[in-house]
């Protein structure tokens, strides 16, 4: 999936759209997506000016966005008005290395379970085959009205 396809499944836009491309998608099972980290991103103005590092919460958000694409593809649907797909839980988060401008973040997500509308995912972010972040994320779709 290219960026235009990604935008059909995520409501996020600049500067908060954190998926650049989907490399692999096994519907109902897993997704591999990319985030190209560039110095031009606004978080690097203050995190940190002399040594820019991607904030850990942004890495987790990129993983959460990958879960959204995977969940919508599994349900053969797209986001609709009056509905929002949201992060409802984060477990076992580990930050092992820093992410800097110029890195390409590989986001790997697999479905663990789906129960009563709550999706649980096992997630990993890597740079150059080295694990950067791992986490278990829980998400659901809710009405906004």
From Swiss-Prot:
Subcellular location per the Swiss-Prot or TrEMBL entry: Cytoplasm
* Any one Gene Ontology molecular-function term assigned to this protein's record: (3R)-hydroxyacyl-[acyl-carrier-protein] dehydratase activity
Question: Pfam families recorded for this chain?
Answer: FabA
An example Gene Ontology CC term for this record: membrane
Q: Which InterPro entries match?
A: FabA_FabZ, FabZ, HotDog_dom_sf
EC number(s) reported in the record: 4.2.1.59
**EC top class named in words:** lyase
The active site consists of 47
**SUPFAM superfamilies, A to Z:** Thioesterase/thiol ester dehydrase-isomerase
Where is this protein primarily located? Answer: cytoplasm
Any GO BP = fatty acid biosynthetic process
What keywords were assigned to this record?
A: Cytoplasm, Lipid A biosynthesis, Lipid biosynthesis, Lipid metabolism, Lyase
Q: Which reaction does it catalyse?
A: a (3R)-hydroxyacyl-[ACP] = a (2E)-enoyl-[ACP] + H2O
Stored PANTHER family: 3-HYDROXYACYL-[ACYL-CARRIER-PROTEIN] DEHYDRATASE
Family per record:
Belongs to the thioester dehydratase family. FabZ subfamily.
Biological function = Involved in unsaturated fatty acids biosynthesis. Catalyzes the dehydration of short chain beta-hydroxyacyl-ACPs and long chain saturated and unsaturated beta-hydroxyacyl-ACPs.
Q: What is this protein called?
A: 3-hydroxyacyl-[acyl-carrier-protein] dehydratase FabZ
Organism annotation? Vesicomyosocius okutanii subsp. Calyptogena okutanii (strain HA)
Q: What is the lineage of its organism?
A: Bacteria, Pseudomonadati, Pseudomonadota, Gammaproteobacteria, Candidatus Pseudothioglobaceae
**Coding gene?**
fabZ
């Amino acid at each position: 999936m290219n960026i235009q396809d990604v935008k059909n499944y995520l409501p996020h836009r600049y500067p908060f759209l954190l998926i650049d491309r989907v490399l692999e998608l096994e519907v109902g099972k897993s997704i591999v997506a990319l985030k190209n980290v560039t110095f031009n991103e606004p978080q690097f103005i203050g995190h940190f000016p002399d040594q820019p590092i991607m904030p850990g919460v942004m890495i987790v958000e990129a993983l959460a966005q990958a879960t959204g694409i995977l969940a919508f593809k599994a349900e053969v649907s797209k986001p609709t008005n009056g509905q929002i797909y949201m992060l409802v839980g984060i477990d076992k988060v580990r930050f092992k290395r820093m992410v800097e401008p110029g890195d390409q973040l590989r986001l790997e997500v697999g479905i663990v379970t789906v129960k009563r509308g709550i999706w649980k995912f096992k997630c990993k972010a890597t740079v150059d085959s080295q694990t950067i972040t791992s986490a278990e994320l829980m998400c659901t779709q809710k009405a906004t009205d």
